[in-house]
């Protein structure tokens, strides 16, 4: 019973303690929550302050960077303005110079017209003077005839003297006729012997093809290669033509690509380049340039080999290497449509055979015949090619007979030996072959194309010039570092104007300026 009473007493006490603990716990929890809130608010304020500070620092940094970038752009703009002003001033100077040249040319034209008028007046005065002089002479002759008619009666002594004079005059006429007949017979005999010698020389020599073609044919294995040669949108053909200066023709002819150019050396270089590209199987602009560089190195061996073969065929050893190389260059030049080396070999063989028939030195005749046109492959000078060829061979102690034959074969100097006459005759025979005179037109066209290229080469900044499309286009390669886009436009106009003033041509000529700038860097 006592235990039950104690339990009833403990239950209310437990409830009281539980309630007290509950309220105490709630009180402490509320106090703790208030503390956490205060701490959180303080932390939030601190974070906001730090963020504001960082934002201000970031803002100051960006303002500094923007100011620096603006100053940099300003400096670049100022520099660009200076460069543009310099270019403008330069172009303005060029325009002023051009205006000065045009004014000077106009003044020269006026002076020339004035001189022509003065010359015309002077010619009229001379003609009038000649007319008066002729009338005076006619009057004097008429008076003399009247005087002779009035003196009809001559004395016996005068008549005898007149008879003697007539007999002497008749004897002189008969003697002159006899001498003239002897001369004609001697000339006929000399012509007969000369014809026999020439016929013997011509019959002993087999002439090769006379006309040099302006086309080269490159055979390919399959027509599928034509698409690779053309390239995407024709870029490979453009790169090939820019590198070689040769037109490449890809048509429906099976397994054939045609190269067209008036310059045989360029055409041979282009042929070697294309053959290298086809053998390697890789065709793109960079590969084209590399193949062209390799072909340019190999062409020197081809030239030397051509010179050595020419000397060997004529049995002419012992020539300096420089002379042999120059002879080899003849393979890539033409004269009146004929390959120059072939023409020189023909002249050498003809001169050698005629020298043998006439018991002269055949070796000297062949040597002079082979070298007579060597001046055509030397750098251009103001001298005729016969004189420049003689001066070139003088440096190698060439025989005086050979030097005279070379210099005299176009009449620039007097012929001093029979060898010189033989070389001149052999040259005329070779150039008189069937088709030679018709080839003169082609040779004139070649010279016209060369003159167009030389006109364009005379301008600053020009690297290479090519006459394409039979002279209807002049493609000019310029230095990208020295010629700007605006200057390229001016250059094209100047070249076209100079061609108009200095060259004669049918139709119109397109002047194309090709400007390329390459930048190379290496990653290490």
Curated annotation (Swiss-Prot):
Principal location: membrane
GO biological process: one example: mRNA catabolic process
Transmembrane annotation, as ranges: 3-23
The protein's Enzyme Commission number: 3.1.-.-
Molecular-function annotations in GO: RNA binding; RNA endonuclease activity
Keywords assigned: Cell membrane, Endonuclease, Hydrolase, Membrane, Nuclease, RNA-binding, Transmembrane, Transmembrane helix
Name listed for the protein in its UniProt record: Ribonuclease Y
């Amino acid at each position: 019973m006592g235990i039950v009473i104690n339990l009833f007493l403990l239950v209310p006490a437990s409830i009281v303690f539980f309630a007290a603990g509950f309220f105490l716990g709630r009180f402490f929890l509320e106090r703790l929550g208030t503390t956490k809130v205060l701490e959180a608010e303080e932390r939030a304020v601190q974070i906001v302050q730090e963020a504001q500070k960082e934002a201000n620092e970031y803002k100051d940094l960006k303002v500094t960077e923007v100011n620096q970038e603006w100053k940099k752009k300003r400096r670049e703009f100022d520099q660009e303005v200076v460069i543009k002003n310099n270019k403008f001033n330069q172009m303005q100077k060029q325009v002023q110079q051009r205006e000065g040249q045009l004014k000077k040319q106009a003044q020269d034209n006026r002076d020339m017209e004035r001189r022509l008028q003065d010359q015309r007046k002077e010619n009229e005065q001379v003609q009038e003077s000649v007319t008066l002089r002729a009338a005076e002479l006619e009057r004097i002759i008429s008076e003399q005839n009247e005087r002779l008619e009035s003196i009809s009666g001559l004395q016996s002594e005068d008549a005898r003297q007149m008879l003697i004079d007539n007999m002497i005059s008749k004897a002189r006429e008969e003697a002159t006729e006899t001498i003239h007949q002897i001369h004609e017979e001697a000339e006929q005999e000399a012509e007969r012997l000369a014809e026999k010698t020439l016929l013997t020389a011509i019959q002993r020599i087999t002439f090769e093809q006379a006309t040099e073609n302006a086309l080269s044919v490159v055979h390919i294995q399959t027509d599928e290669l034509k698409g690779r040669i053309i390239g995407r949108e024709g870029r490979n053909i453009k790169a090939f033509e820019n590198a070689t200066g040769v037109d490449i023709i890809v048509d429906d002819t099976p397994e054939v690509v045609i190269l067209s150019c008036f310059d045989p050396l360029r055409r041979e270089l282009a042929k070697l380049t294309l053959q290298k590209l086809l053998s390697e199987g890789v065709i793109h602009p960079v590969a084209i340039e590399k193949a062209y560089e390799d072909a340019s190195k190999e062409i020197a061996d081809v030239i030397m080999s051509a010179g050595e073969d020419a000397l060997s065929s004529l049995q002419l050893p012992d020539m300096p290497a420089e002379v042999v190389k120059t002879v080899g260059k003849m393979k890539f030049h033409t004269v009146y449509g004929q390959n120059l080396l072939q023409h020189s070999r023909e002249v050498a063989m003809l001169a050698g055979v005629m020298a043998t028939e006439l018991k002269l030195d055949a070796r000297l005749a062949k040597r002079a015949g082979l070298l007579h046109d060597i001046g055509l492959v030397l750098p251009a000078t103001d001298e005729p090619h016969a004189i420049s060829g003689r001066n070139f061979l003088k440096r190698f102690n060439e025989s005086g007979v050979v030097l005279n034959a070379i210099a005299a074969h176009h009449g620039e100097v007097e012929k001093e030996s029979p060898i010189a006459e033989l070389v001149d005759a052999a040259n005329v025979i070779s150039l008189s072959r069937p088709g030679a005179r018709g080839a003169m037109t082609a040779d004139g066209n070649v010279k016209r194309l060369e003159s167009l290229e030389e006109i364009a080469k005379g301008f600053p900044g020009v690297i290479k010039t090519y006459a394409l499309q039979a002279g209807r286009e002049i493609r000019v390669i310029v230095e990208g570092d020295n010629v700007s886009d605006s200057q390229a436009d001016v250059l094209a106009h100047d070249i076209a104007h100079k061609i108009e003033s200095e060259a004669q041509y049918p139709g119109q000529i397109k002047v194309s300026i090709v400007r390329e700038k390459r930048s190379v860097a290496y990653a290490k």
